[in-house]
Amino acid sequence: MDSFMKRVLFLSGPVLTLALSGCLSEPSSDAKRPEKAAEPVTGQLALYRMYQVARSWAPDVEVLAMHSIHVTEVPDVVGSAGAWQATFISEMKNAARSYTYSVIEADPNLHLGVFAGQPESSTNGLTTPFLIATVKVDTNAAYKTALAKTSEAANEQKTHTISFLLDKQEKFTNPSWRVVWGESVGTAGLSAYIDASTGEYLATMH
């Protein structure tokens, strides 16, 4: 066998070994890893996400109200929600605008991330606009306080979805979280107000 053929045979061994090892290699860890399920978020986090987008519409926006949205495709975690809707108001534009924040795309009205609605004429209601900086207490902490201060809550939480509303009413000094045992205030038999600035318990509603 001449020297050329010897060199060819000598080189083909490592090349073949590499080719076989490539075929037999294990799939990457990324290929094995299942897609992570969407997780709900707390109210304060969702509020700040929407506020960042709302400021591009009007730099003087203040919060008018916010509420949680129950999304059946997202796991229930007390103190969090799969989606939230907030309304911001601009004195400069004399208008209000609603935004949603969702952790998943859920047709027809919920879109992944922050989604802006159309501006509407500003109207005076029962709630007062407030600065986002006054919301210092998150929904998970508000829930714990409401549960501790409301004796009936332990039984109610076993059979009801927990919902949250944020606004500033005339009867309270600061904006407040309303922790609702139910999907809405209208259908709930129990709710509690927690100060969104200090975390103090304010009142129970039946």
What are the functions of these language-model segments?
Residues 1-26:
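Secretory targeting signatures
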Residues 9, 23-206:
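Long, terminal "pre-/pro-" and other extracytoplasmic accessory regions
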